[in-house]
Curated annotation (Swiss-Prot):
Lineage of the species this protein comes from: Bacteria, Pseudomonadati, Pseudomonadota, Gammaproteobacteria, Enterobacterales
Oligomer status and interactors: Homotetramer.
Family designation: Belongs to the glutaminase family.
Gene3D superfamilies hit by this protein: DD-peptidase/beta-lactamase superfamily
Pfam families reported in the protein's UniProt record: Glutaminase
Domain of life, per lineage: Bacteria
Binding site for substrate: 89, 140, 191, 215, 267
Protein's recorded name: Glutaminase 2
Listed EC numbers: 3.5.1.2
EC top class, as a word: hydrolase
Amino acid sequence: MEITDMPTDDSNNGIIDYVSTGHLPDPETVVKLVQEAHKRFSTDTAGVVSNVYPALERIPADLFGICMVGTNGKIHSAGDVDYEFTIMSVSKPFVFALVCQAIGAKTAREKLGVNSTGMAFNSVTAIERASDGRTNPMVNSGAIATTSLVPGATSDEQWKFIYDGLCRFAGRELTLNEEVYQSACETNFRNRGIANVLQGYGRLGCDPIIATDLYTRQCSLNVSARDLAVMGATLADGGVNPLTRERVVDNDICHYALAVMVTAGLYETSGDWLYDIGLPGKSGIGGGIVTVSPGKGGLGTFAPLLDSAGNSIKGQLAARFLSRSLGMDMFVSEPYTEKN
């Protein structure tokens, strides 16, 4: 029996599921450490602002915001947490979760794939290297395929499904950055090519032009570091938004969304991210990173200076510092002590 043939659901043959998630430190400690992270890394000038779209190039390079939202709804922040930027690829795990909710996690894996490609986020070769055209929902090819599976009889209905779902994750109505959207529509030749290749492999659920447009729109929504923290905390809280208390997706769906974030959330540097930080994360060229600590909360960061892989440098530094200092790293255990 292959592991992919195993049941993909939240039933464990009648056995009660237990989770080991712990909790965040007291609120005073959390806010102190968030402020310390901002102070430590705010002067770092490494990296470059994305030049993919003119609107991104104009973002002030010194902006930096950190927000931690616990599953209890408490918000701790420092810096430019309300500055709005385009969500870009950080939208991917949330749309994937919405699609899993709609069609089932097993079907989503069969249609999209979940393994890391080890290649750049916009690689066409990754599709062709896979014998069946499946990649990963966290890279562009897999994300476009994911978006194509959104339910709806028309593209308007599909967009409403995506938009409403992302707004529910954020707990507020999001706005579309028309300038970025129009610029992307005029220049997204590579994504159009990716969609056509996917169509050739039979991996799209709708017309490639529609799939590319829907994907472009979802990436052009404005969010803040605070929004990302709330969205991450919703995944951390089993699909329930900790501010609105609305259930966005089922508890088991969060497992699958976090799993693909671990495999490819920071593209070809996902291994380095996991090695250093030990948590599911997702980055975007707009400068945002969302980090999720299951059962504890979501961390949203914004800083537009990026490394060569398109990941926010300050965001990575802040996540590394806070994952350990707040006790969120999934791979760190309590130090062993001899017991009498």
